UniProtKB/Swiss-Prot annotation:
Residue positions, PTM Phosphoserine: S347, S354, S408
Cited function: Plays a role in the delivery of peptides to major histocompatibility complex (MHC) class I molecules; this occurs in a transporter associated with antigen processing (TAP)-independent manner. May play a role in taste signal transduction via ITPR3. May play a role during fertilization in pronucleus congression and fusion. Plays a role in maintaining nuclear shape, maybe as a component of the LINC complex and through interaction with microtubules. Plays a role in the regulation of cellular excitability by regulating the hyperpolarization-activated cyclic nucleotide-gated HCN4 channel activity.
Compositionally biased residues, Low complexity: 74-92
Domain of life: Eukaryota
Chain ranges passing through the membrane: 480-500
Positions on the Lumenal side per record topology: 501-539
GO molecular function: microtubule binding
Assembly and oligomerization: Interacts (via coiled-coil domain) with ITPR3. Interacts with SUN1 and SUN2. Interacts with microtubules. Interacts with HCN4; regulates HCN4 channel activity.
Protein name: Inositol 1,4,5-triphosphate receptor associated 2
GO biological process, one term: single fertilization
Key words of the record: Chromosome, Coiled coil, Cytoplasm, Cytoskeleton, Endoplasmic reticulum, Fertilization, Immunity, Membrane, Nucleus, Phosphoprotein, Transmembrane, Transmembrane helix
Family assignment from sequence similarity: Belongs to the IRAG2 family.
Amino acid sequence: MLCVKGPPEQEPEDGALDVTRGCQCPLPTEDSILGQELLDCTRMNEDQSTDENGAGHFYSESPSQLREYLTQPSSEQTSSSESTVTSSESGSDILHMASGDLDCKPLCEKEEEARAASAMQGTSLAPAAYGDYTSVGVAKAASQLEAGEELRTTENGGKGSAPGETEISMPPKASVKLVNFQQSENTSANEKEVEAEFLRLSLGLKCDWFTLEKRVKLEERSRDLAEENLKKEITNCLKLLESLTPLCEEDNQAQEIVKKLEKSIVLLSQCTARVASRAEMLGAINQESRVSRAVEVMIQHVENLKRMYAKEHAELEDLKQALLQNDRSFNSLPDEDDCQIKKRSSSLNSKPSSLRRVTIASLPRNLGNVGLVSGMENNDRFSRRSSSWRILGTKQGEHRPSLHRFISTYSWADAEDERSDVKARDAPEPQGEEAVERTRKPSLSERRSSTLAWDRGTICSSVASWVTHLQASFRRANRALWLTGLIIILIAALMSFLTGQLFQTAVEAAPTQEGDSWLSLEHILWPFTRLGHDGPPPV
């Protein structure tokens, strides 16, 4: 059981109750009921108030009479009740604040501090507001009950943890969030909010823009009408005062009052003009504040867009650099392959026992049978060379030339390829083939047929290569130049034909061979004509 110490008793002044005397009732135990304790406290407070003041016999008769008396309207009662309520609320707030720190101060000291604070705010209470005081006592008792319950819970917790001595009561820690994640969420949420606000503002401004001129005209018209009406009223007042002055000629005081009224009306007109101007200024300032807020939102939205643009631009630049590096590496690989192929071809041509490079010409589209024949011959040559590779046997470490590289890039050094092929044909066969073919020597007819076949193959391959060169050069060259040259040639041929037809001289029907050693087409075809006479035709 905890005892509540009260402050030293003081004599009541002017028949008022002592507010500093609190509810001196014991705290409830575990088996007690809250309602009974509250009723006991109220009864004890009533008894104390009746003993000290002697004016409580009316209030202790019945609670119904107390309620009826409290409901009666009275200005003094309302004022006193408001003061007591404020004091009680402040006291209860202080008690609640004190009950949260039971580990630092004992309960009695907190009660004393609460009563001292309530005594500083209001020290006297009227007899008519005693019902309010009882409500204040009930609130204090409830706060004391809460404080006692918290104290018991802390004591029970201390007793339970004492024998074990293993449990350590730690204060609850706040949940820690990741700063970066929270900042990113906040920034994204802020950006979304700013964007939504920007959309709302832009839509509102666009909608207001359509009716802005009409609204301005209407407001100006209403302002002008109000000013005109005010001026008319002021002029009417002045006229009435002027009509009143002759009636008040005998009375000096009335004349002075009329003059003062005239001056006040003039000042009123000036004040109305000033009020109108100040009102316009105030409206402009308010509109400027609203517009400044909207502009701030728009500026923030633009900054967000700039930040997003800078981020995406940086990502785009990085992607471009990565693509350029990949393109460079991809382009460098074919160049290296071409260099290796050239070196390998030169080494193969220099060494008679090494392998020879294989080239397959790409088939032209518009060449017809020539391209097909050349492609078939190249395929035959490739099959023969592959058989020679199988006979000779290649090393495992050597790489065979890739065919698709030569198919896709046939246009480079075709003449060198053909020359190397001719040299390779004219060169003696490797030692392996000589060792295989020593058993049987070819005859003279076989040699002639083989040389004829090789000559035909070389001619066809050279024609095909020339056609492919011509096609490639035509593709590379500017088509406009080719077209202009072709048009010029056609125009020259047409002009020569026309000049020959226009400026041709008339000749006799009989062909003559005087002074001309060249035989014309007429002289050749003249004997085959239908004219059968041998002499010249008649003139």
